[in-house]
């Protein structure tokens, strides 16, 4: 099913028992985080806080708190079908012309989907039903203060829209935003992210000139999830959202700039970043489970707030996994696999364990074809997609290992690895500045673990053979297993 806006999606979730309305007065200061966290841990529903303390605007939390709801938001039945989206992205990243008539017929569905990529530009839109310009105050937003040590309320689910001076496509990214004053927030974007790259190019091309920015809150689920999906750099997240939705993304021009924002967003913040204006951001509790260091980031000055009537404020919290970002990571893991397999066909599975903060550790299983193959795959993971430049640990195993089963992975590490021979250490590589374990902010090391069976060129030892029972014996025991009644006998004895 496809959804025109966030409200369509919420109506479906409520009909399926996947949305809970909270009628009691709940404080955005800490209380919403605690309720959302307990609900997420229990794989509970999305939450709509109808009476946030001190505010009239309802707050939506835990929207993507299960992988099932992530799949639903992408218009899919369940998480298993997300690999089809990955196959589509792999095709868009490196499209291949049809090799013949049959191949053309097989590719027609992809070509038809591409027709949904261009934006549909509206002259008026629900997101501009109400306009605040004079004496605007960001305090009208029920922004959550998530953790006791946080310095200020935080806008967490804003889709930041930017455009570089030499680019036609607009970039959508999600960056946390500290509320600084009535009309200013801090834009915490890392140097490699699309918004930061657009801003850097703008400063070079238009020195001293304000950089237009817009932030959309409460867009439709396809647009929200399009902003966190690894789309090719040349493709706009709006275009990919159209593919997800099955029809073109509706946008409207900002009041203060030429940027286009989701027409059905609940709230839009318009404004600019004045080059050189920065402020100290943090500390905040983040997805690692720790409070991060403070650092200076650009300041976004808000000139307009536009919104729908009876707008809904979309929010979340981040903390030690599992949290909502880690659930998103687990779902998007399925999207990454076909993209990696197109470049490295030997990859069988790829897994980012949520407890590894969604991206800091990856387990890869491969069909090994030559000595040193595992190291090539490590290098490929670190370099092929920008999303993995901050992955600190890559474990490569053979395809007889289940990448998603720690018992299998640990067994492979402890039986197939020599620490000196099979550990690859690389120093002075890009690291998330939130990673306080690195010796220098933004720069640290990476480790690759080759837990594959070694070929003759890689060892002088006779390699071990895995133990496996004869099939005939297994068949014989299968035939008499129920007759043995072993477990029922044990339960009778325990009584």
Curated annotation (Swiss-Prot):
Query: Which keywords fit this entry according to its UniProt record?
Result: Cell membrane, Decarboxylase, Flavoprotein, FMN, Lyase, Manganese, Membrane, Metal-binding, Ubiquinone biosynthesis
Q: Which GO terms describe its molecular function?
A: 3-octaprenyl-4-hydroxybenzoate carboxy-lyase activity; metal ion binding
GO biological process terms, alphabetically, are: ubiquinone biosynthetic process
Q: Which InterPro entries match?
A: UbiD, UbiD-like_C, UbiD-like_N, UbiD_bacteria, UbiD_Rift_dom
Q: Which residues form the active site?
A: 286
Q: Which reaction does it catalyse?
A: a 4-hydroxy-3-(all-trans-polyprenyl)benzoate + H(+) = a 2-(all-trans-polyprenyl)phenol + CO2
Which residues does the annotation say bind prenylated FMN?
A: 174-176, 188-190, 193-194
Q: Name one Pfam family in it.
A: UbiD
Give the GO cellular component terms, alphabetically: cytosol; plasma membrane
Bilayer topology term: Peripheral membrane protein
Report the transmembrane regions from the record.
none
Q: Which residues are recorded as binding Mn(2+)?
A: 171, 237
Q: In which pathway does it act?
A: Cofactor biosynthesis; ubiquinone biosynthesis
Cofactors that this protein relies on: prenylated FMN; Mn(2+)
| EC id | 4.1.1.98
Do the record's keywords include Glycoprotein?
no
EC top class, in one word?
lyase
* Annotated localization: Cell membrane
NCBIfam families attached to this UniProt entry: PRK10922.1 (NF008175), UbiD family decarboxylase (TIGR00148)
Q: Extract the PANTHER family matched here.
A: 3-OCTAPRENYL-4-HYDROXYBENZOATE CARBOXY-LYASE-RELATED (PTHR30108), FERULIC ACID DECARBOXYLASE 1 (PTHR30108:SF17)
Q: How does it assemble?
A: Homohexamer.
Instruction: Tell me the HAMAP family matching this sequence.
Output: UbiD
Q: Which family does it belong to?
A: Belongs to the UbiD family.
**What protein name is recorded for this chain?**
3-octaprenyl-4-hydroxybenzoate carboxy-lyase
Q: Which organism is it from?
A: Hamiltonella defensa subsp. Acyrthosiphon pisum (strain 5AT)
